[in-house]
Design a protein with these regions (language model features):
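Bacterial N-terminal signal peptides
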Residues: 2-12
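A general, composition-driven signal for non-globular sequence regions
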Residues: 9, 16, 26-28
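General secretory precursor processing signal
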Residues: 11-14, 201
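Boundary at the C-terminal end of the N-terminal hydrophobic targeting segment
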Residues: 13-21
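Metal-dependent phosphoester/phosphodiester hydrolase catalytic core
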Residues: 26-503
Length: 503
C-alpha cells in the first residue's frame, strides 16, 4: 500500500518577542540536565509508536527519518525536514504529499477550519461536495511549520458534508470517514461532546477507542492535557517529532478528519512532569517557543484575551466551552495559577455565557481528594479556586460542569460547598489506560461518583436543551462500548442557591 494511502493540526502564530533570558544558576542548570535525561529516546519512541497496533513498515521508516532530522538540534523545524535529502527521496518514492491532517477544528455557526501539514511548501484547498468552488488556496510555508489552515464557510446546520483536500491541485488520500457534520441549531436538538485526557501518545493509536468516539457522532472532542508530546522540555524539534508520531496513527487520522478537536495542555505537553511557568534553567523565550509549536500543531479558535498561554472560549451546539491554561502562567506566587489576566478573562466569560450548560476545563483536578491536590489547585492556589467557585455562586451562574485530568484513571466527584450547593467534577484521564493513584477511598464514599484504573475510557456529555429544565447526561464509556457510569443532571441541580442558602 503506498504510504500516501497509509497516511490516510489551529492557526499558526509567529513567534512572540520574548524577554532577555536570565543567566541560569548552576543549580538550575543541573536540575534542567537531570530532567532532560528523562526525555524518551528513539527506542522508547518506536515502542510507543507500535504499542497498541503495529505500524506499517513505511510509516516506521518515515518516523525514523523524520525523528533523526528533528532531534538533531533543539530548534529543528519541519522546514529543515523538508530540505533533508533522505526525506525528499522517501516522499518521492512513496508519493507522499502531506504529513498530517486533515484535522477539523474551530467550529463556527456556518463552518469549520481544516488543518493540513504538507511535506514541503504548497498550496492547500478544500473541496466540499455540493459547493461550486473549493475553499482556499492557503499556502503552507516554512514560517507556518508547513501548516495550512483552510476556513470552510457557508455550511448549513444539521448537515453532513463529505470533502476532499487538494495539495498543489492534486487530491490527497483521505481517511474513509472524512466528513464535516455541522451541529443542529434546532432548540430541541441533542448534542454530544466527547472529552478526556492522558492518551500519552500511545492512546492516540487505539483504533477501537477512536472508532467508538467517532461512531457516537459527537459534535466535538475536547482533549485537555498529556495528549501527543511526552516530556520534551525546550527541545522544539522533539516536540515536532511527537506531533508527527500523532499523525502517524491511522486511528487518530480517522477520528479528527470527521470530529472537530479542541485542546489545551498539561505538564507533559508543556515541558515535563509537574513543570509549569518558567521551569528552573529555562527562559521566558523557551516558554513562548513551546507555546508556538503547540499552537501550530492544533486548530483552536484563538487565545483568550491576548497572545499569552493557550486558553479560550467557544460554543459547541448549545454548550459554552471554556478551556483554561493551568500551566503557562504559574510563578509560585499566590494567585498565579491562572494569572491575573486569565482570571479576569474567565470571570467575564462566565457572566457572558448564554447556553444552558458551561463546560469548564482544568488540566489538573479541581478537587483535592486524589493525591491531596498535588501539582494542582489545592497545593498551588486554593485561594484562586475559591475565588472561581465563590464567583459562580455569587452570580448564580447555572449549568457549570467541571472537567479535569492529570491523575491517570478516571474519577468523578461532588465538591460540596458551605452553601449546600455542590459542584460536579468529571475526570476521564483514561485515554491511555495508564495506571495512576488510587481510584477510590472509604473517605470519599459520600462524594465520589465513580473510579477506574488501567483501562481505556472516555467521557461524554449528551445535552438535551428541550425540557423546560434542560438536562445533561454524563457517560464514562470504555473502548469496548460499555457504559461504565452514567449520571443525568438537570440545569436546576447545577444552579447555585440564592444568598440566604446555608443560613
Amino acid at each position: 500500500v503506498p504510504l500516501a494511502v497509509a497516511l490516510c493540526l489551529v492557526c499558526w502564530s509567529a513567534p512572540s518577542s520574548a524577554a532577555e533570558p536570565k543567566e541560569a544558576t548552576p543549580a538550575a542548570e543541573e536540575t534542567k540536565k537531570k530532567a532532560e535525561e528523562k526525555s524518551p529516546d528513539l527506542a522508547t519512541d518506536l515502542k510507543v509508536l507500535n504499542q497498541v497496533e503495529k505500524q506499517p513498515a513505511a510509516v516506521q521508516e518515515l518516523y525514523k527519518i523524520a525523528r533523526g532530522v528533528l532531534s538533531a538540534k533543539p530548534e529543528a523545524t519541519y522546514a529543515d525536514l523538508a530540505q533533508d535529502a533522505a526525506f525528499q527521496r522517501f516522499c518521492q518514492e512513496n508519493r507522499l504529499t502531506h504529513l498530517g491532517g486533515p484535522m477539523l477544528g474551530s467550529l463556527s455557526a456556518d463552518g469549520v477550519k481544516v488543518w493540513v501539514r504538507t511535506v514541503k511548501p504548497a498550496k492547500v484547498e478544500v473541496a466540499v461536495d455540493g459547493m461550486a468552488k473549493a475553499f482556499g488556496p492557503v499556502s503552507s510555508t516554512a514560517e507556518s511549520d508547513l501548516v495550512a489552515v483552510v476556513p470552510v464557510t457557508g455550511l448549513k446546520p444539521g448537515t453532513r458534508y463529505t470533502y476532499r483536500v487538494l495539495v498543489d491541485g492534486q487530491p490527497i488520500a483521505m481517511p474513509e470517514p472524512a466528513a464535516i457534520t455541522m451541529p443542529s441549531d434546532a432548540k430541541a436538538a441533542k448534542t454530544r461532546i466527547a472529552f478526556g485526557t492522558c492518551p500519552h501518545r500511545w492512546g492516540l493509536g487505539n483504533s477501537k477507542q477512536a472508532e467508538l468516539i467517532r461512531s457516537r457522532q459527537p459534535a466535538a472532542l475536547l482533549a485537555y492535557g498529556d495528549i501527543a508530546v511526552q516530556d520534551r522540555y525546550s527541545h522544539l524539534g522533539l516536540h515536532r517529532a511527537d506531533y508527527l508520531m500523532r499523525d502517524c496513527f491511522a486511528a487518530w487520522r480517522s477520528l479528527v478528519c470527521a470530529v472537530p478537536v479542541y485542546v489545551s495542555w498539561d505538564d507533559h505537553d508543556y515541558f515535563g512532569n509537574d513543570l509549569a511557568g518558567i521551569p528552573p534553567g529555562y527562559t521566558d523565550q523557551n516558554r513562548r517557543q513551546v507555546r508556538d509549536v503547540f499552537r501550530s500543531s492544533w486548530i483552536n479558535p484563538g487565545c483568550g484575551s491576548g497572545e499569552e498561554g493557550t486558553y479560550f472560549r467557544t460554543r459547541i451546539g448549545p454548550c459554552d466551552v471554556i478551556m483554561l491554561d493551568t500551566r503557562y502562567f504559574r510563578s509560585g506566587k499566590k494567585g498565579s495559577y491562572l494569572g491575573d489576566e486569565q482570571m479576569a478573562w474567565l470571570e467575564k466569560q462566565l457572566l457572558d455565557c448564554k447556553g444552558p450548560f458551561i463546560i469548564l476545563s482544568s488540566g489538573t483536578m479541581w478537587s483535592d481528594y486524589v493525591s491531596g491536590g498535588k501539582d494542582s489547585w489545592g497545593k498551588c492556589d486554593p485561594a484562586g479556586r475559591e475565588r472561581i467557585f465563590a464567583f459562580i455562586e455569587k452570580h448564580r451562574i447555572p449549568g457549570v460542569l467541571l472537567i479535569s485530568g492529570d491523575r491517570h484513571g478516571a474519577r468523578g466527584f461532588r465538591i460540596p460547598r458551605p452553601s449546600g450547593y455542590a459542584f460536579y467534577e468529571f475526570e476521564p484521564a483514561s485515554l491511555g489506560a495508564r495506571t495512576g493513584p488510587k481510584v477510590s477511598d472509604p473517605a470519599w464514599k459520600d462524594v465520589q461518583l465513580f473510579g477506574i484504573d488501567k483501562q481505556y475510557a472516555f467521557g461524554e456529555f449528551e445535552v438535551d436543551p428541550s425540557p423546560a429544565d434542560p438536562e445533561v447526561t454524563f457517560r464514562l464509556i470504555d473502548d469496548g462500548g460499555k457504559t461504565i457510569y452514567e449520571l443525568k443532571l438537570k440545569r436546576s441541580q447545577l444552579t447555585p442557591p440564592g444568598p440566604d442558602a446555608g443560613k
